[in-house]
């Protein structure tokens, strides 16, 4: 019986010794002054809570197109006509979009120029 009373009194002392947070202490002020991230706002206790219905839009950076591809008007990567192994090896593409030693035909396809090397 004496051990139960001793444990109870020890637990009571621990609870009483624990300091209570004050509104003016430095730690509490630092938490209250920290701004919430987008789509969150502080409640009356200083805790950041999500705003209902708010959607976070992430800034997604478009990766560049691979070799033999270029961006079209819709910002999509489309294959450059006639670009093949030769253009990939030399990485030389003329303004019409065809590889070196190629020219566009009336149908828009790139054709090899005879005798060009």
Curated annotation (Swiss-Prot):
Keywords: Disulfide bond, Nematocyst, Neurotoxin, Repeat, Secreted, Signal, Toxin. Residues 29-117 are annotated as: 3 X approximate tandem repeats. Its main location: secreted. It comes from the Eukaryota. It is found in: Secreted; Nematocyst. Contains 6 disulfide bonds. Expressed outside of acontia. Sequence repeats lie at residues 28-56, 57-88, 89-117. Residues 1-23 form the signal peptide. Putative neurotoxin. This is Structural toxin peptide sea anemone type 9a. It comes from Calliactis polypus (Hermit crab anemone).
